[in-house]
Amino acid sequence: MLRSILMSMPASLKFLGTGGARFVVARQLRASGGTIIRAGDVTLVMDPGPGTLVRCARSRPPVDAASLDGVVLTHAHIDHSCDVNVLVDALTDGGLRHRGLLFAPRECLEGENAVVLRYLRPFLEDVVVLKPETTYRVRDLEFRTSL
C-alpha cells in the first residue's frame, strides 16, 4: 500500500522485522517489527507489528520513537498494527507534545476492529484516513497508496 517516491535526498528503509502470518508472529520465528522509512528530515514507521518499540531501541543505530514524525498503517491485522498505540504515546510524550501524524485506512480507526485507541488520537497533529490511489506528503517524503 505504500510506495515511497524519493527525490534527490538521503533516503533509507530499515526493516525492524520481516515476520508475518500468525504462527511466525506468535512464535517470533522472525521479528515482526515493521519498517522505518527515512527521507530527508522525515522518519516514519510503517506497519508497527509486535515488538516495534523494542526493535527501535535495539536497532543500530537506535531509533528514538519520540523523534518519529508519524506512523503508517496499511491494514488492521495484528502483525501490522500491534504497536501503533505505544508508538503514538511515545512520539507525543504521552500526550504532552501535540505532534506527529497517523496515516491509516478507515478500518484501523472505526468499527469493531479498530486498532488505534481513541484517547490517543487528539495527541497527534493529524490523523489521515488513507484512500486508494492517493498521494500523501510529509515534508520531504511523498508516498502513494495502491488499490
Describe the role of every protein-language-model region.
Residues M1-M7:
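Short, Lys/Arg-enriched N-terminal segments with co-localized hydrophobic residues
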Residues G51-F103:
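Active-site metal-binding motif and surrounding structural segment of the metallo-beta-lactamase
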Residues R99-L147:
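Metallo-beta-lactamase
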